[in-house]
Amino acid sequence: MANHKSAEKRIRQTIKRTERNRFYKTKVKNIIKAVREAVAINDVAKAQERLKIANKELHKFVSKGILKKNTASRKVSRLNASVKKIALA
């Protein structure tokens, strides 16, 4: 265990940040999974609706500093491509 006050504080901060990061990472995964599920069943309307939500949420995470800009853009771009693919088919 920590012997210094500053080390104890760092442990508390790490625990708090870990919980917060886990929450956001799970949320990102669930958002992406929702779009992919709609694409898998070829439901264009649902996929486009969920893509719109995913785009908004992922860019919100960028502004909060949870995701990097390029990471969010890459994820949105790939989701967009998959939705576009079923829309044209």
Curated annotation (Swiss-Prot):
It holds the Pfam family Ribosomal_S20p. One of its GO terms (biological process) is translation. Transmembrane segments: none annotated. The keyword Iron does not apply. The keyword rRNA-binding applies. Disulfide bonds: none annotated. Keywords: Ribonucleoprotein, Ribosomal protein, RNA-binding, rRNA-binding. One of its GO terms (molecular function) is structural constituent of ribosome. GO terms for cellular component: cytosol; small ribosomal subunit. Belongs to the bacterial ribosomal protein bS20 family. This is Small ribosomal subunit protein bS20. The lineage of its organism: Bacteria, Pseudomonadati, Campylobacterota, Epsilonproteobacteria, Campylobacterales. The gene is rpsT.
